[in-house]
């Protein structure tokens, strides 16, 4: 689903536009000028549905070069092993989330809690996957002609990242699950989730220019993206 030139929504579950598997997070693809990058990979139960959306949007799997992983919860990283094997792409994430993804242990990922709540079926298992490049909060790097800056998303997960992407004169903020539409946050009884962590990460986003707001679930915003960050900060008393 094309959002604007060089930016597509290629996966989304029941909490969003329901393009692919019911439990999938929002999966985005953007053109770097030297291949496409995915942001997150969905839950991995039917990852071919995301590949089908890519191809339906005219994006060849052979042109997908990167996967920016915001965090290693199952609905975001479960499809990563499939895409790495099929596309041969480079997985980029933080050191902490890379370790969680490589081990894929239910209790580390909060899957035991999520299964108990009924969010995941009991037989769900995320496939472990190795990251290829480790990045850190405060780091900026280039993918083709696109600049990517890393911001903390700690508070939702132990080492989660938001990615601020400068593309064609616009700034795109991929928040993972740190903030969703209208500044909502999600406090859960899973490792690394904390109110204080949310406060620190959201406060750090205060200086960022945000045109387009692209969360891991639910509605996104093609204009006035910074307002969603500001609403989160206001709700936390920042």
Regions found by a protein language model. Name each.
Residues 44-45, 140, 147-236:
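Metallo-beta-lactamase
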Residues 22, 49, 79, 225-228:
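Residues at alpha-helix caps and immediate loop-helix transition turns in enzyme cores, especially N-
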Residues 37-39, 68, 91, 172-174, ...:
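Residue-level marker for buried hydrophobic side chains located in beta-strands
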Residues 1-57, 162-176:
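Conserved beta-strand hairpin/beta-sheet module of binuclear metal-dependent hydrolase folds
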Residues 45-48, 55-139, 231-234:
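Active-site HxH/HxHxD metal-binding segment of metal-dependent hydrolases
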Residues 33-36, 60-64, 144:
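Short, surface-exposed connector motifs at secondary-structure boundaries
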Residues 7-15, 119-123, 144-148:
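Short Pro/Gly-enriched beta-strand edge/turn motifs at strand-loop
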